[in-house]
Amino acid sequence: MSNSSNKFAVIGLGNTLRRDDGIGIVILESLLNSCKRERVDYFNFGIASFDLIYKLREYDSVLLIDGLDAGLAAGELKIFELKDISYHLKGPALSTHEFDLKSLFELYKRFELKSKIYVAGIQVQDVSFGDSLSQPLKDSLEHSISETRLFIDKTLLSF
């Protein structure tokens, strides 16, 4: 973890060529354009990689934004701590790309990361090839952005 105190990151995950799977990147880009905050670093990690684990170590708190398949209503946003993943989500697939949230959770435990990691997960409907969001995600996009922005202000920046 970083020697500097109160260091925060917001990280978008997803594949923008797989329709709803790109929702994490869409929300991240909106946040960058509308509410960039001091003390918060923003990163586009796309479909993620092991580099993400090393990036997480640099921050006290991190918010990951990602599309997920958790049996919720399409477009529904759920924000939770990564350590609570098994309590909040059901179903075999928590993420819609190769480096999923379950894998990240296992690596988080294995590497004994000290960062507090939150996940803003948005239920996907369609992850077929294409570059536009499904209608339910388009309809809920502004709500997801405003709730994510509110979470950043009230939780990450309340220290």
What are these regions (language model features)?
Residues M1-K114, V119-V124, D131-H143, E147-F159:
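N-terminal catalytic or cofactor-binding beta/alpha core of small enzyme domains
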